[in-house]
């Protein structure tokens, strides 16, 4: 079980909300992995990894926006924005060294749009090039395409789901009532 805490609502309730979120998820069983909130820059190297049947899986999460809210000055943790490409690259490369599979979640794009933006496509390709194995997008509240990218240098095929739509929502528009569950098999070969 993996919980991404990096999205446009991460800062909605300020430092108290961040602290309450961290406390809640810290009390979960050990098989629950959280990602997307970091206790400052010193914590960026702490890559969330879960081992399943001998396969080490790293989970990273980023957000494009926090709806204009800055990181609260007294917050116990912060998100990493999609504009922080140097940090994202460093984390993916570090995760690649520590794990067999690197899964990257990105909260991005335009709400209500079925078409990925140029920025989504560009960052998605960079994330693939930096070493991600799977890229899972959220935020638009509607389904966007699932495609296969080719990582530069390695030629590795990297699936990207630009937006899974809504899983559970109170939004009434027909397009907002549809979501996708992305499934994939992981097989360790070496």
PLM features per residue range, with description:
Residues 1-190:
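Acidic, metal/ion-coordinating pockets
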């Amino acid at each position: 079980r993996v919980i991404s805490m990096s999205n446009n609502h991460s800062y909605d309730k300020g430092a108290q909300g961040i602290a309450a979120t961290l406390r809640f998820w810290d009390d979960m069983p050990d098989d629950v992995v959280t990602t997307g909130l970091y206790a400052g820059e010193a914590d960026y190297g702490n890559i969330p990894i879960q081992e399943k049947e001998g396969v080490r899986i790293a989970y990273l999460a980023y957000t494009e926006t926090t709806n204009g809210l800055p990181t609260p000055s007294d917050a116990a943790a912060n998100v990493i924005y999609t504009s922080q490409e140097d940090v994202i690259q460093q984390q993916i490369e570090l995760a690649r060294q520590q794990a067999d599979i690197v899964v990257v979640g990105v909260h991005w794009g335009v709400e209500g749009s079925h078409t990925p933006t140029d920025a989504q496509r560009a960052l998605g390709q960079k994330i693939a090039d930096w070493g991600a194995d799977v890229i899972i997008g959220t935020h638009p509240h509607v389904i966007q395409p699932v495609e296969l990218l080719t990582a530069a240098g390695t030629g590795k095929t990297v699936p990207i789901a630009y937006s899974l739509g809504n899983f559970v929502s109170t939004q009434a528009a027909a397009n907002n009532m549809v979501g996708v569950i992305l499934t994939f098999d992981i097989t360790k070969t070496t």
